[in-house]
Amino acid sequence: MKIFKEQQRFTQTWLIILLAMSIIVPIGIMIQEYAKENTKMTTNEFLLTLVGILVSVLFIFFFKLTTRIDEKGIHYQFFPFHFSLRRISWSEINSVNVRNYDPIGEYGGWGLKGGSLWNKAKGKAINISGDIGIQLTLKNGKKLLIGTQKESEAKRVLDTYKNKII
């Protein structure tokens, strides 16, 4: 019995740099305002605003995509949107394959994507980084793409369970 497990987080260097640069200006303006002699900003307001900015930016690092493939099906969780693993059993799947995709062109970027605002024909995507995903087409017609950084391992385990797709 083969099992595929993967956990991904938003840890890309470019994202960290972008987020750091995006908070420099607001924090700089806030510090400058607080440092003025006749400021109306209290210490509590300053600290609360500073913590608010930092927490809102750092929140993205709590996101985690967990994927598991086993004899029961394909399980996924995108925390904080899903608090537990969601399972798609093999009997619900019409087809599954690992493929390259264009995150921005096909789904509008990374994260929990798809639905009414983007290309409905592509279905939904749950991804953290990269351009490789596990593409599922379900028997009810819905499509789901789950991003992966472990292409060969995912293919190997999926090949083991393809006979379970009826």
Predicted regions: what is each one?
Residues Q77-K142:
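Non-transmembrane, membrane-adjacent beta-strand/coil modules in membrane-associated proteins
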Residues I3-F4, W118-I166:
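A membrane-cytosol interface segment of integral membrane proteins
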Residues M1-M41, G123, K142, V157, ...:
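N-terminal membrane-targeting/pre-transmembrane regions
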Residues E71, W90, E151:
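ATP/adenylate-binding site constellation spanning eukaryotic-like Ser/Thr protein kinases
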Residues R68, R87, L145-T148:
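Short aromatic/basic micro-patch
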Residues I53-V55:
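Extended, compositionally biased eukaryotic interaction scaffolds
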Residues V57-G73, Q77-F78, F83:
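Transmembrane-cytosolic junction motif
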Residues T39-V51:
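Hydrophobic alpha-helical transmembrane segments
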